[in-house]
Amino acid sequence: AETVEKLAPEMDNISAKLKQVDDAISQIDENRYPKTINGMNVRENITQAKATVSGLASSLSNFQPIVKLLPDLLGNPDPRKYLLLFQNDAELRATGGFLTAYATLTITKGKIEPGISEDIYTLDNGFKKKVPAPDPIKKYLPLVYNWNLRDMNLSPDFKVSMDTFTTYMRESSVAPEYDAIIAIDTEVPVRILKVLGPIGVSGYGGKFSAENDPRCDCPQVIYELENIITKPTYEIREGRKSILGPLMNSMLANMMGSPKAKWAEFFNIFTESIEQKHLLMYFKDENKQLAAEALGAAGRLTTYTEGD
């Protein structure tokens, strides 16, 4: 957190310099150069370089608001509590997947401390209020008469869904404390494990990896997650409750201990997951929420006027 704190004030300067480089390189007309010289793809390389620099300049500009908040987000000076939601994209919902499990973690001056890790039904079991199911639930789930927390991500606008979810979640007897919500789907652990390689998870035998599993012709971690999460509760109750937290913990620990050469890959995973809505953020604090929206990480729907 202290290192980030030193970096944050430099972001404006770094962004301005990168913008100057982008402006300069964008003036280069690649069509004035031959396609190849001695077997080297000159024109194609220039085009790719221009696109890369332009993308970096744009990304850094979008990241500035959130980077300036990073010390605070990493628990400096005060600890920050995060609620992780797992969206199972094999069962589609408006925000990206069925809300299957949740976990909590606390970050204090950059140090991550795991909290609880539970099945989403644990949260619902503590929610005793009878809220009539809205029309979409009644239409597609006719035997569900009440609106459960697990079904409250009805709006494709993530903030709207989380406003609803958190409003009612407060009434659950087991509602966790949080400063922010981070929702991920199966694509996030797959991408991270492609960089990390197979990792162990405390309390579970074997390894979790992104390698293809012939049982599903999909990444092994997806098979294991869905196998554990979708089994009937009476068969594997403890597994359902605990898989998300330990898996995320193990991945975070392995990422933090990775060589610096891999950090760029993790950064790319983070940015691509945000761009493709595999990772979504929701903050209680308005300034942090606005920063997440500027980054494109808040899953907001944008209304365009005619002519835009």
Model-predicted regions and their roles:
Residues A1-D308:
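Non-catalytic, solvent-exposed segments at the cell envelope interface
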